[in-house]
């Protein structure tokens, strides 16, 4: 048994999963930080909206140069920190006897439980961080989140960042997360 509760921080799908854990195991979670992750209303119709999954089967490339040239952020966005993208790309690949491939698990979306109709009910303090250029910021989903969670969740925006806040503004994001964790401790 844990001696103290934990803080969860998640981006995109990770934020969605962190909110699920905070809802299902409130005795475990002290605070929740969600970074540009949509929490959809229970009546959201997933079948009417385009999804980024499932992932495609693993593809092999003949050279490191070729696979690195294919690296993209998903969803696509411009990024001014090329050095950071190169770093992420370099650590997202591995060489095998069949060639170069991405490290992701192509079984991920088959193993995840869909949360259609799930009503998130976390009660811990929460912070939602979004980039000012994120498509989520002006969406109906954001309006739902602000309405449903305004009593327990703060909403903060990092200027000049899109969905991949941690790539666009890593220092600003780290500072905001650290400030919130200090406030909660």
Task: Describe the residue ranges of each PLM region.
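Conserved serine/cysteine hydrolase catalytic core
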Residues: 94-148, 154-157
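Core-facing hydrophobic residues within beta-strands of well-ordered domains
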Residues: 3, 28-29, 152-153, 161
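Conserved alpha/beta-hydrolase catalytic His-Asp/Glu region
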Residues: 60-114
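Flexible "cap/lid" loop of the alpha/beta hydrolase fold
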Residues: 19-23, 28-62
